[in-house]
Amino acid sequence: MSKPFVAVLMGSDSDLPTMQATLDVLKTFDIQFEAKVTSAHRTPAATHAYVTDAEARGCKVFICAAGLAAHLAGAVAGITTRPVIGVPIDNGPLQGHDALLSTVMMPGGVPVATVAIGSAGAKNAGYLAAQMLAVGDDELAAAVKAERQKAAEAVQAKDAKLQAKLAQ
């Protein structure tokens, strides 16, 4: 079996600009990943085959992005017992609200961990996958913790700058 990896599945190639945030986070932590366009509706057999094969090859987390009806994450969760993270894409007439509801409303026993709509959610999907993998990887856990510390220091620096400006 190869090194553990994350599978990033998108319902359309138009989802890539949003999902680039996920890929960037995974790269930050040197997490191996595969990215693929597949559809719960248009290519269900291919989606099933990929998920089954990816799991056999060492995929530990699936991140699924889709807009509108957004059944990809739910379809994947029905195939695997690996964690599935759903990213609702902010497109269509409802700007992702339909995708959010389609992704989050799963039957009991078939969970999808759903993040926010759009790019913020895509970024958090990468961090959530890293945290899931870090449960069994102390080095990755330390890297995630260091990244959080770096973000905290950036906030503190901004506050210090604000306080200095207000003191003038």
Where are these regions (language model features)?
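Glycine-rich phosphate-binding loop
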Residues: 50-92
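C-terminal binding/interaction regions
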Residues: 4, 9-17, 21, 97-168
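Short glycine/serine/threonine-rich phosphate/pyrophosphate-binding segments
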Residues: 15-19, 44-47, 66-75, 94-97, ...
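Short glycine-rich or small-residue beta-strand-to-loop segments that form or flank ligand, phosphate
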Residues: 5-10, 34-36, 62-64, 85, ...
